[in-house]
Amino acid sequence: MKKESLIFVSLFTAVISCCILFVSFAGKIEERKQYVKIEVQEGDTLWELADRIKGGKTADKHKFIEWVADKNNLPTSVIKPGDVLILPVAKQHSDQYQLAVVE
C-alpha cells in the first residue's frame, strides 16, 4: 500500500507540474501576440517612439522605454536604423501609431 501511495503522489505531482509548465508557456506565446515588431527608421529614438505611443504622460514614457529596453535586451537606450524592436502595442491597434510594422 505504501508503494502504491508513493507512485500515486509522484504521478500526481508530475501531471500538475506539466500542466503548470504548459499554462505558463502558453501565456508567453499569447503575450507576444499582443505586441508588434517594428524596424527602427532613421531619426527614431526610444523617447520619440514613447511619445508617439504613450502621448503626454512622462511616467508612462519612462515605463515604456524601460519595458522596450528590457524585452529587446538593449544594453543602452540608443537604437539604430534597421534594429527590429518589439513594442507593447496591440497588433490590432498598431495602425493608429503609424509605425513601420515588420510582419
Curated annotation (Swiss-Prot):
Residues annotated as transmembrane: none
UniProt-listed InterPro entries: Cell_div_suppressor_YneA, LysM_dom, LysM_dom_sf
Localization (cell): Cytoplasm
GO terms (BP aspect): division septum assembly; DNA repair; negative regulation of cell division; SOS response
GO cellular component, one term: cytoplasm
NCBIfam families: PRK14125.1 (NF010723)
Protein name, as recorded: Cell division suppressor protein YneA
Source organism: Bacillus licheniformis (strain ATCC 14580 / DSM 13 / JCM 2505 / CCUG 7422 / NBRC 12200 / NCIMB 9375 / NCTC 10341 / NRRL NRS-1264 / Gibson 46)
